[in-house]
């Protein structure tokens, strides 16, 4: 039905995709005192200063955003806070404070790569090209690209966007996906790049564009604010795999982060986390498979 997001996949499809996803997980060997931390690892600075710098975006609701008190909140923010607690315990630190570093969709990767932040927690999709600059943790979410339109429009599927204007946030995987689908389906539409999701939603509501393509749950976060004005198309244009952004080549830090994630997934609290941030719903079969794969043993 138009305007509703369906995240549950058939069992056969979910099983197949889960098998593929299995290759994307790296098992965190148990950390021990006998495993020395390399001198150039971010862990050295984190342990010395007892501060870990986490980059976040304010426009990635419900994965990362600011509340009325200007405090970072969201699904991935919660996960990263659990990881920080784990790192503190892994290295027996008396305290480990979080320094929040605001970033944009354009600066999120460079902030980690240049050392302004130790990790980025939001809605960043894993791609091979991005691994040339930064690294990723094990997967924390699986999503798909969708399109939001005005509820009173005559657009009912992606094919109806022929001859229309589609907004995408510049530099996102969604931009690439939309262009690929337009070419694949031989559709002539104009792709309009914007700086962030707020600008895209404003353009859609003002009639400056006919659709806004992004990750479906991010679109749902915008739709819930304007339930009567906006509708979600049924098309799934791609599978987006989210992870925490980490410094490239820092295996020790990545191991510590993945250990924290594995501990959280094994604790069996993933459904509570999902329900908190995704409108009280339950994770679909594919996401449940991801959570199961994330319960890596020490």
Residues covered by each model-derived region:
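Ligand-binding clefts/hinges and TM-proximal coupling segments of bilobed small-molecule sensing domains
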Residues: 33-37, 173-192, 227-232, 262-298
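Extracytoplasmic small-molecule ligand-binding "clamshell" domains
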Residues: 34-120
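Periplasmic-binding protein-like
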Residues: 58, 141-152, 198, 216, ...
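Bacterial N-terminal signal peptides
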Residues: 12-27
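A ligand-binding cleft/hinge motif common to bilobed small-molecule-binding domains
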Residues: 106-107, 121-133, 177-184, 202-239
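Bilobed "Venus flytrap"/periplasmic-binding protein-like clamshell domains
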Residues: 58-62, 72-89, 125-128, 143-197, ...
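Acidic, polar ligand-binding/catalytic clefts
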Residues: 81, 85, 92-160, 230-231, ...
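Extended ligand-binding regions for polar small-molecule ligands
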Residues: 33-37, 43, 74-86, 152, ...
């Amino acid at each position: 039905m138009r305007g509703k997001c369906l995240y549950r996949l058939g069992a056969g499809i979910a099983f197949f995709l889960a098998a593929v996803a299995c290759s994307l997980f790296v098992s965190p060997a148990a950390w021990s005192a006998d495993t020395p931390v390399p001198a150039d690892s971010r862990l050295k600075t984190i342990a010395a200063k007892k501060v870990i710098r986490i980059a976040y975006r304010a426009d990635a609701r419900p994965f990362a955003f600011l509340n009325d008190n200007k405090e970072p909140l969201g699904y991935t923010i919660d996960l990263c806070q659990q990881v920080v607690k784990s790192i503190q315990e892994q290295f027996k630190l008396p305290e480990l404070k979080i320094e929040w570093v605001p970033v944009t969709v354009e600066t999120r990767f460079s902030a980690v790569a240049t050392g302004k932040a130790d990790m980025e927690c939001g809605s960043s999709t894993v791609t091979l090209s991005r691994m040339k600059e930064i690294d990723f943790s094990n997967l924390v979410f699986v999503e798909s690209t969708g399109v939001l339109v005005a509820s009173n429009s005559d657009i009912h599927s992606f094919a109806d966007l022929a001859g229309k204007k589609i907004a995408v946030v510049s530099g996102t995987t969604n931009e690439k996906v939309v262009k690929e689908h337009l070419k694949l389906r031989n559709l002539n539409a104009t792709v309009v790049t914007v700086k962030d999701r707020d600008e895209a939603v404003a353009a859609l509501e003002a009639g400056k564009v006919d659709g806004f393509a992004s990750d479906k749950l991010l679109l749902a976060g915008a739709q819930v604010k304007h339930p009567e004005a906006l509708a979600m198309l049924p098309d799934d244009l791609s599978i987006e795999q989210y992870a925490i952004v980490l410094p490239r080549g820092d295996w020790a830090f990545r191991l510590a982060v993945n250990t924290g994630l594995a501990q959280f997934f094994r604790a069996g609290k993933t459904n509570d986390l999902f329900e908190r941030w995704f409108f009280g719903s339950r994770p679909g079969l594919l996401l449940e498979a991801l959570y199961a794969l994330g319960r890596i043993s020490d």
